[in-house]
């Protein structure tokens, strides 16, 4: 896969589906997008999901270069890379936190591009809240609070913090995408952390998405942990299992339709 800005290769192959001895077609790949820190680090803790898993990291995280047109420009860039590097066909999109917003944006772009060769059979948001514009100014001014692991180098912590501030600023211009007339929205699942970061924090079941003018979330499943502990050893097994099973459910109607043609 060819290199991008800062020497980063996108997409990154996080998990590879073993095709040895299998006569049936491979499952639809899962394409995951980076979190607010621009990294794919957490996704490498996922247990086997039974399909190819690709990841898109922010190629400008190290340099700090701005995306002038915000999330839309970022998504256009990733979609171009996706068409260059991933085989056309059915795909499942997803992401943790900020990555879920990118997945939604890409899903809308793919639906609008009839000649692109991809069909999104489902979207999985991993504890992705609907952006609250009122919270942007305080996050940018005070800096994000991120509980880093002890083994994360100081230089990487600084890159993540800087990326999170930049991405938070981009959210102030972002609106949840709507699907073009005549196109049906793919099923969208929210895997929601059972706990809040703050015990006093009140979070709605759909994490604010119910306030959108149009329905975004079709179903919600709870997973153990809070926003930052989802990928820790005590919780990663359940998260992986829910993600694996949800991908199977989303893909099943499309595989049945293809086999009957």
UniProtKB/Swiss-Prot annotation:
Induction or repression: Expression is up-regulated more than 10 fold in toxin producing cultures.
SUPFAM superfamilies xref list: alpha/beta-Hydrolases (SSF53474)
Protein's pathway: Mycotoxin biosynthesis
UniProt GO molecular function: hydrolase activity
Coiled-coil boundaries: none
InterPro entries listed in its UniProt record: AB_hydrolase_fold (IPR029058), Thioesterase (IPR001031)
EC number: 3.1.-.-
Phenotypic effect of disruption: Produces smaller amounts of AM-toxin than the wild type but still causes lesions on apple leaves.
Keywords: Hydrolase, Virulence
Biological process, per Gene Ontology: biosynthetic process
Family membership: Belongs to the AMT4 thioesterase family.
Other comment: Gene clusters encoding host-selective toxins (HSTs) are localized on conditionally dispensable chromosomes (CDCs), also called supernumerary chromosomes, where they are present in multiple copies. The CDCs are not essential for saprophytic growth but controls host-selective pathogenicity.
Function: Thioesterase; part of the gene clusters that mediate the biosynthesis of AM-toxins, host-selective toxins (HSTs) causing Alternaria blotch on apple, a worldwide distributed disease. AM-toxins are cyclic depsipeptides containing the 3 residues 2-hydroxy-isovaleric acid (2-HIV), dehydroalanine, L-alanine which are common for all 3 AM-toxins I to III. The fourth precursor is L-alpha-amino-methoxyphenyl-valeric acid (L-Amv) for AM-toxin I, L-alpha-amino-phenyl-valeric acid (L-Apv) for AM-toxin II, and L-alpha-amino-hydroxyphenyl-valeric acid (L-Ahv) for AM-toxin III.
Protein name as annotated: Thioesterase AMT4
């Amino acid at each position: 896969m060819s290199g991008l800005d800062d020497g980063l290769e996108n997409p990154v192959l996080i998990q590879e589906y073993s095709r040895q001895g299998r006569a049936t077609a491979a499952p639809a790949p899962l394409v995951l997008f980076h979190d607010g820190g621009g990294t794919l680090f957490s996704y490498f803790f996922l247990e086997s999901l039974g399909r190819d898993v690709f990841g898109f990291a922010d190629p400008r995280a190290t340099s700090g270069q701005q995306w002038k047109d915000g999330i839309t420009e970022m998504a256009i860039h990733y979609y171009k890379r996706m068409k260059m590097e991933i085989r056309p066909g059915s795909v499942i999109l997803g992401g943790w936190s900020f990555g879920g917003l990118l997945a939604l944006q890409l899903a809308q772009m793919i639906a609008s591009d009839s000649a692109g060769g991809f069909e999104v059979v489902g979207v999985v948001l991993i504890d992705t809240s609907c952006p609250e514009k009122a919270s942007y100014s305080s996050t940018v001014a005070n800096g994000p609070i991120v509980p880093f692991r002890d083994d994360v180098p100081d230089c990487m912590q600084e890159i993540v913090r800087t990326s999170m501030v930049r991405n938070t600023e981009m959210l102030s211009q972002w609106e949840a995408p709507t699907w073009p007339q005549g196109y049906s929205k793919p099923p969208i699942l929210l895997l929601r952390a059972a706990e809040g970061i703050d015990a006093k924090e009140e979070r709605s079941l759909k994490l604010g998405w119910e306030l959108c003018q149009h329905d975004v979330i079709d179903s919600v499943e709870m997973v153990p942990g809070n926003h930052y502990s989802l990928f820790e050893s005590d919780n990663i097994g359940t998260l992986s299992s829910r993600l694996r099973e949800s991908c199977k459910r989303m893909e099943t109607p499309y595989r049945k339709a293809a086999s009957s043609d």
